[in-house]
């Protein structure tokens, strides 16, 4: 919802669903101060529809969408919500214990108002081998904390929650490296951070001599993925494809399985910023009648 102008003049905005016959009583309790709200947004609210990707573009990684990849300043971030109470975070500790990441912290209600607080734990990998989220929710807890009191929070996060899908090997993997963990009241309101080393796999390079499936790209521009019922597999149509972390080895030639719709086409292979080869692709009756060039 684009309510940029309204929120400049309103100290708070209550967002609710129909919520049933008790909505009126609940609403009255909130606006009168008898109850301190602690709802949190489960989505990112952008300032304008122009910040959204085209409706036919569903790839949130390429389009830097959702709280995972968005680099702008949203109207309201993922996990956001107001409260009548005020909380302070302290004593943040993060450790790797075997297959578990142990996280602990203290949260103090420094106001006189009793209220729930939703503690959110996010993480990101530093210098990943592929594009990873800027922050990713990995745990949260909602607890009632009386005014002036402190609550201790502990989270045991399975290390498998840090995994990503390695397209080069078509499997999930926890990559070895440095991970930053963040504790906050929303995806933008981060109060404490800590970076630790996490054991895992060293992602191996792509060995071109073993072949690469076109669909297992790291990035693309202008290309579309299609599916051939005849071949029972996906193929890429047009544009360009990017494959990172490749090893050419001692190869002296490259084979590409491809086809062209109507006109004679051309495929160019670049490696390390240099053009390795170019191949002419003759037109066929069916684009999925591939040939090796």
Which functions belong to the PLM regions below?
Residues 1-116, 122, 147, 175-195, ...:
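Secreted, periplasmic, or luminal enzymes acting at the cell surface/secretory milieu
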Residues 52-53, 123-142, 275-278:
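Short aromatic-acidic-glycine turn motif
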Residues 88-93, 137-142, 166-167, 239-243, ...:
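Short structured motifs
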Residues 98, 145-150, 284-285:
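Solvent-exposed, conformationally flexible loop/turn segments
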Residues 107-109, 157, 258:
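Hydrophobic beta-strand positions in extracellular immunoglobulin-like domains
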Residues 121-127, 183, 269-271:
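Conserved aromatic beta-strand anchor motif in extracellular beta-sandwich/beta-rich domains
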Residues 129-171:
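Intrinsically disordered, low-complexity Pro/Gly/Ser/Thr-rich segments with frequent PxxP/GP/PP motifs
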Residues 176-180, 187-293:
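Extracytoplasmic
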């Amino acid at each position: 919802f684009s309510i940029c102008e309204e929120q400049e003049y309103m100290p708070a905005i209550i967002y609710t669903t129909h919520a049933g016959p008790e909505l009126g009583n609940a609403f009255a309790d909130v606006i009168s101060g008898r109850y301190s709200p602690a709802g949190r947004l489960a989505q990112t609210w952008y300032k304008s529809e122009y910040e959204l990707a085209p409706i036919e573009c569903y790839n949130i990684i390429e389009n830097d969408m959702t709280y995972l990849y968005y680099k702008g300043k949203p109207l309201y971030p993922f996990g956001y919500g107001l409260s009548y109470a005020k909380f302070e975070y302290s004593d943040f500790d993060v450790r790797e214990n075997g297959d578990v990441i142990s996280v602990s912290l203290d949260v103090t209600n420094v106001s006189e108002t009793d209220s729930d607080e939703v503690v959110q734990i996010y993480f990101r990998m530093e210098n990943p081998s592929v594009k990873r989220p800027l922050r990713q929710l990995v745990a949260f807890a909602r607890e009632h904390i009386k005014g002036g009191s402190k609550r201790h929070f502990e989270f045991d996060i399975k290390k498998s929650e840090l995994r990503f899908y390695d397209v080069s090997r078509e499997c999930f993997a926890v990559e070895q490296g440095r991970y930053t963990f963040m504790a906050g009241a929303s995806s933008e309101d981060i109060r404490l951070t800590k970076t630790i080393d996490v054991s895992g796999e060293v992602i191996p390079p792509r060995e071109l001599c073993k072949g690469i499936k076109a669909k297992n790209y790291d990035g693309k521009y202008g290309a579309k993925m299609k599916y051939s019922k005849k071949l029972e597999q996906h193929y890429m149509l047009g544009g360009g494809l990017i494959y990172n972390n490749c090893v050419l080895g001692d190869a002296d030639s490259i084979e590409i399985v491809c086809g062209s719709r109507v006109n004679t086409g051309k495929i160019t292979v670049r490696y390390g910023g240099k053009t390795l080869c170019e191949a002419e692709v003759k037109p066929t009756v069916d684009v999925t009648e591939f040939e090796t060039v």
